Amino acid sequence: MDNTIYYVCKYTPKEIFSGFDQPTERLDPAPTNFECAESCTHPNLCGYGKALIEEVMKRDIRRLLLVDCCDVCRRIYDVLWHQGNMEFLFLLSLPHKNTASSVSLLERELQRLQTELLALTGENFNPDKALHAWKSGIREAEQQTITEPHVRLIGAHGGTLLKEMIEQRMPLPVQDDTCTGRRMLMPAPECWADTAYASALLNQHRSCMRMQFRIEEPDDTAVGTICHTIKFCDYYGFAYRHMRAQKEETLLKIETDCTPQSSGQLHTRIDAFAETIGAGANQIKKSENIHYIAGVDSGSTSTDAVILDREKKIVSSVILPTGAGAASGAEKALAAALESAGLKREDLDAVVTTGYGRETVGLSDASATEITCHAKGAHYLFPDARTVIDIGGQDSKVIRIDENGNVVNFVMNDKCAAGTGRFLDMMAKTLELTLPEMSELGLQWKNEVTISSMCTAFAESEVVSLVADNTAPEDIIHGLNASVAGKTSSLVKRLGGEPAYIMTGGVAQNQGVVKELSDKLGAQVYVPKEAQLCGAIGAALLAFGER
């Protein structure tokens, strides 16, 4: 029988367990699905809650301590207690303040835990063993502290899976300071005392972001911070906004549901962040004696290729459908661009790829994220630009850039098709129109129509209903354009975007969306004729050594 007592939170009083000679292990859930959890929980429970229940049920864990740092932990306790399979299930009440009364409250909770453990084990608490574990834990935390340049991971539980994935995407170590990461108690006294231990546990360094107080030690070697949140979690978003307002460090916010994530969107966010802080795993070297450079943007809908000469002038360009495979689509686009320029593959000094297929096309000398490439391409096309709005087939991005085209910050909408080119493409098919026809008709509207749902499937149902009511196609298209513009303007405002605005990507060809977006932002949105080539242009420019 497994006598291990499992736990999750870094506020777990592990030293108390050591005083009872009880082995402990921190759970690090990363289920592939929530099959067990969804059979006994509400669907809106956060991903971490479901992941933890899934882990407990599938591993048949019978001993568990939870800390009631949030409602989800309380609900996990309720579910597991109701099932009646646990031999030991303890919910520790954790104060959110560090006043004297808070320490007293936690001390009483620790004494209650000792009573429960006495009943479970039949053994008395050994304060010397607990004190030894306390001191050992401090030494362990010191060994875990990274003193070389690194990236901090903070916020909600990310686990080994997320930490390793981030480390694979950038050549820097990651310091895990999430709520289940590095545990740094205050120094131990010479003799055990419940009050001193309660105070040390409550006032540990890198305090939980849910606390109403902050105990932070300086981290001068951190070059950037990744703030991780869980879907449906209400806590960490507020802390992230507070940190952003301070503007003291380079921040990236990511969100997962605790299942294994290898999506292109998450990789794009992390890779772009690495490039922003100068830690890209695939740093592009400047080509010498340049004659011709090719940039290839392998997107979800189209693959764009551009060839620049030594003067950074566009020699040829091509836009082709990506088709069934990113690699074959990129090969065709590059071949077409070479043919148009009257060049051969060996005439190119370098090929740089970007887009979601950038790492799989297999024809490049280097690759970079579309965040960096669109920033460089936008600066090339419109040097006055300070905010880049890129709406592609699969996602939409807003990028703030400086006077040199360097990325200052960015946000992405990549969770669904809403507000993207795919959304408009599906609506065009529903209306039996081509995208150019849709662009023209959208400017001829007469009556205001509101598309209330931003979900692609539900919006399609609304469009079908409007068609059934004989609503003019022009008015329906205007409603769709306003819907896309509204979602995009929200991203711009969230990022703090400012004029001058430039729009790139395929949706920039839709005049109705551009007009609605300009109206909502209160400033003209510039659309260059090479808008859809912006990413490929930026990729090629990177080979010139532009940073």
Regions found by a protein language model. Name each.
Residues 356-357, 493, 497-520, 531-532:
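Glycine-rich phosphate-binding loops at beta-strand->alpha-helix junctions
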Residues 248-257, 370-371, 518-537:
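Conserved phosphate-binding/catalytic loops in two-lobed NTP-binding clefts
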Residues 296-328, 332, 336, 407-415:
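Short glycine-rich, Thr/Ser-proximal phosphate-binding strand/loop in the N-terminal lobe
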Residues 1-293, 311-313, 323, 416-423:
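An N-terminal assembly and electron-transfer interface module characteristic of large anaerobic redox
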Residues 287-311, 386-405:
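Gly/Thr-rich phosphate-binding beta-strand-loop-beta motif of the actin/hexokinase/Hsp70
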Residues 459-492, 532:
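Adenine-nucleotide phosphate-binding core of ATP-dependent small-molecule kinases
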Residues 268, 421-425, 528-547:
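Glycine-rich phosphate-binding/hydrolytic loop that grips phosphoryl groups
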Residues 322-326, 408-443, 447, 541:
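Glycine-rich phosphate-binding loop plus the immediately following alpha-helix
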